[in-house]
């Protein structure tokens, strides 16, 4: 089999590339996906409110685990990644958050990455998006990904939480992806107008999969990329339960889009990476690149949970006897509780003036429950997810075997810097102050977690060690740049090799301020033009907010927590 391009991974970026490259009817593409189809009648992936279900099994989730995390009481922590058409866009929380403009401007400060500034990238965010309230300077109106805005009156807790943030002295923003990210406001979601998950399989592949020049293989586990000298010339994979490899040749390029955990593994199995690691497994060295699998980053978060004094939370939706009605309303009408991920409000703040742009993110949820659906509080409640955005901690992904079915050694080194601890202490204390604003008085009951007895630095630190969880945002393991630890250049081309690019969240040099999916899709759109040799979209002229030393909040808290 021969194709012009072979794409490994039908995820948030891979599906973008498959769709854009096959717009040229003379270009042939093979898209390999280790998981299965995105079954449209499976409520677990298609119903926004069911977002916890895919994380509880292994049909759609790689269900990786970390090595014992040394600064987290040696816990082995979850590292869920999407498996199936759509990749992690098939199982994520559907929060459409792009990050802060200064994240991308910060990338562009690196020599050679000047074309990755915010205004260079904004046209590609817009190209990917159809926002339900129409386009403007920041948002698209005819892109493949449906974005739904929060509507008034969905749940009184959303507006109360936003208002509490404003009463605490922080800004209000009407669009976390618009002129000003900093502040509290409604959160956009990747949900269709009919209440379905807007994965990249739905948005992109649906328009491309019938093209004769696109071949899609599911249940195709990539073993390795093979080379002719320093040129990538094809891919070998295992189909289904077969132990006999299948191979195909790439006439132009192999495009690695397997994500921040799998992309470095595939490179390492293919002979690209740290020479000592490869020698350990008798893998012939094709090209030494010490940065492969290093620079691993993530967002860590924790929940502050409160009893809700009024019966307005989503607690009744967790009762089995209410779920058939919710399911029917969603299935036949695309409306109701099932049609939202219920992350409809949130915010970004600077915890201290030393940060030039927000370093803390909030997701508000009108129920008290773990992200993966476990440990639901058996009463009306609500919670704040809060976490730091740009931790200096760095980890790694390293193969433990040549077997593609063997999970790698993953270590994030969460909380390995003093800055991490300071940010989480600040975040918990600021959150408590926000929760004690007048806007929440009629709803706020007792603090369920961490609990009012948890006050000192030592107590807060111990709570974080035992209870903080991943936000499922790994990135950085094939970083873009030109230093000795960089893996790809500004166009995703792997240093020292030909015919091979990496296009996914692994190329992010530094993690962004917010959820990763929207930016991963943008990376796919921007790289697609580069691969096709097309001129970049014209640079945007939109204005964007820069704090420039402004106070982190307009006034002191209006009341003390206690």
Swiss-Prot record:
Database matches in PROSITE patterns: GMC_OXRED_1 (PS00623), GMC_OXRED_2 (PS00624)
The family database entries (NCBIfam families) matched by this protein are listed as: betA, PRK02106.1
Enzyme Commission number: 1.1.99.1, 1.2.1.8
Q: What is this protein called?
A: Oxygen-dependent choline dehydrogenase
| Family named by the database record | Belongs to the GMC oxidoreductase family.
* Cellular component terms per the entry's GO annotation: membrane
Q: Which residues are FAD-binding?
A: 4-33
Which cofactor is essential here?
Answer: FAD
Q: Which residues form the active site?
A: 473
Listed SUPFAM superfamilies: FAD-linked reductases, C-terminal domain, FAD/NAD(P)-binding domain
Q: Which Pfam families match?
A: GMC_oxred_C, GMC_oxred_N
Q: Which gene encodes it?
A: betA
Q: Which reaction does it catalyse?
A: choline + A = betaine aldehyde + AH2; betaine aldehyde + NAD(+) + H2O = glycine betaine + NADH + 2 H(+)
Its BP terms in the Gene Ontology are: glycine betaine biosynthetic process from choline
For whether the record's keyword set contains Oxidoreductase, the answer is yes
Task: Report the function annotation for this chain.
Answer: Involved in the biosynthesis of the osmoprotectant glycine betaine. Catalyzes the oxidation of choline to betaine aldehyde and betaine aldehyde to glycine betaine at the same rate.
Q: Which UniProt keywords apply?
A: FAD, Flavoprotein, NAD, Oxidoreductase
The pathway entry for this protein reads as: Amine and polyamine biosynthesis; betaine biosynthesis via choline pathway; betaine aldehyde from choline (cytochrome c reductase route): step 1/1
């Amino acid at each position: 089999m021969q194709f012009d391009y072979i794409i490994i991974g039908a995820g948030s970026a891979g599906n973008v590339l498959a769709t854009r490259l096959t717009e040229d009817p003379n270009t042939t593409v093979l898209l390999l996906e280790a998981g299965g189809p995105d079954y449209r009648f499976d409520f677990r992936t298609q119903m926004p409110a069911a977002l916890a279900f895919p994380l509880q099994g292994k049909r759609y989730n790689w269900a990786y685990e970390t090595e014992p995390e040394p600064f987290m009481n040696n816990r082995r922590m979850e590292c869920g990644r999407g498996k199936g058409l759509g990749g992690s866009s098939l199982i994520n929380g559907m929060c459409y958050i792009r990050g802060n403009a200064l994240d991308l401007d910060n990338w562009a400060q690196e020599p050679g990455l000047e074309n990755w500034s915010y205004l260079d990238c904004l046209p590609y965010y817009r190209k990917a998006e159809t926002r339900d309230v129409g386009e403007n300077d920041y948002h698209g109106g005819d892109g493949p990904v449906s974005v739904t805005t929060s509507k008034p009156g969905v749940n009184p807790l959303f507006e109360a939480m936003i208002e509490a943030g404003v009463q605490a002295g922080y800004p209000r923003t009407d669009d976390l992806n618009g002129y000003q990210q900093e502040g509290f406001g409604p959160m956009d979601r990747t949900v269709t107008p009919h209440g379905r998950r807007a994965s990249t399989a739905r948005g992109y592949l649906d328009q491309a999969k019938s093209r004769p020049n696109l071949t899609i293989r599911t249940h195709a586990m990539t073993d390795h990329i093979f080379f002719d000298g320093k040129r990538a010339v094809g891919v070998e994979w295992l189909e289904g339960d077969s132990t006999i490899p299948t191979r195909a040749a790439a006439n132009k390029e192999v495009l690695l889009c397997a994500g921040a955990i799998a992309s470095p593994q595939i490179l390492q199995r293919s002979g690209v990476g740290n020479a000592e690691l490869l020698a350990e497994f008798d893998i012939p060295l094709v090209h030494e690149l010490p940065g492969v699998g290093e620079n691993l980053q993530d967002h860590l978060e924790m929940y502050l949970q409160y009893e809700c004094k009024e019966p307005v939370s989503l607690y009744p939706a967790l009762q089995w006897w209410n779920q058939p009605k919710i399911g029917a309303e969603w299935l036949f009408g695309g409306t109701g509780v099932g049609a939202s991920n219920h992350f409809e409000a949130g915010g970004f703040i600077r915890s201290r003036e030393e940060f030039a742009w927000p370093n803390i993110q909030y997701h508000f949820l009108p129920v008290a429950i773990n992200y993966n659906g476990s440990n639901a509080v058996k009463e009306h409640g609500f919670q704040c997810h809060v976490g730091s955005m740009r931790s200096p901690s760095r980890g790694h992904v390293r193969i433990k075997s040549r077997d593609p079915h063997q999970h790698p050694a993953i270590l994030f080194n969460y909380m390995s810097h003093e800055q991490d601890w300071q940010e989480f202490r600040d975040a918990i204390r600021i959150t408590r102050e926000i929760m004690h604003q007048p806007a929440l008085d009629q709803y706020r009951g007792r603090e369920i977690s961490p609990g009012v007895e948890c006050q000192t630095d030592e107590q807060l630190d111990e709570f974080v060690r035992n209870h903080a969880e991943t936000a499922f945002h790994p990135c950085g393991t094939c970083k873009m740049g030109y230093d000795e630890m960089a893996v790809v250049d500004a166009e995703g081309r792997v240093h020292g090799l030909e015919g091979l690019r990496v296009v996914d969240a692994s190329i992010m040099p530094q993690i962004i301020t917010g959820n990763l999916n929207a930016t991963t899709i943008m990376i796919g759109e921007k790289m697609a033009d580069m691969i096709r040799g097309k001129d970049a979209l014209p640079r945007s002229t939109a204005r964007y907010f820069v704090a420039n030393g402004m106070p982190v909040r307009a006034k002191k808290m209006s009341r003390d927590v206690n």
